[in-house]
Amino acid sequence: MDEQWLPDLLRLRGSVAAASDEFYAAKENLIKPDAPSFVPEMYDAKGQVYDGWETRRRRGPGGTLPDDTARDWVIVRLGVPGVVRSIEVDTAFFTGNYPQACSADASSASGYPTPEELTAEAHRWQEIVPRALLTGDARHAFKVNSGRRFTHIRLNIFPDGGVARLHVHGEVVPDPAMLEGLTVDLAALENGADIAARSDQFYSSPRHVISPELSRVMGEGWETRRRRRPVTSGWSSV
């Protein structure tokens, strides 16, 4: 299975619940739908503006360097629950201020837990991506082998730094309790539908057609390459 072909569960109206720090750049940037960008001459009161989530440098008493366990973290709520198959950590444009390493944990929670509940010691997390090294200005894909259904992801970075985007690819598994008594769109991605096959996705994926968000630009629709006789039609199967 190509995990990158699976839907991004975080992009389906996901949100950012909490973070240990966001001194240099806001945690919400992690889930922006646009590709990361960088403007070299753009500064604010805190320095160079980065399109991502960036924490301050961690220091111990007297300015000592952090030990190997020091970390920052961010918790995101998936737009729809699902079985996570891969996580992608993108450090685009973070070249001297990227984290040395990362790991990821997952949780399955009912309802809408508060940030305080998600960060409480009693809240249970399962490691799904062991600690792994990162490099700057690069996309890092980590395969996830757990077959469990999750609602929240916690990304840990060691010891601090910046991440441009977070992607969580997997299979949508909606909560039946949220659909009970409702008339739902059975062809909607957020209700568990998906693209079974397609003739072509040269320019963009047919999954855009069943995604919940309205298209902002042409690239957020489905477009195939030009066809000539004898084959003159494209198709997708939901």
Predicted regions and their residues:
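Juxtadomain low-complexity/linker regions and immediately adjacent membrane-anchoring helices
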Residues: 1-68, 85, 93-121, 143-236
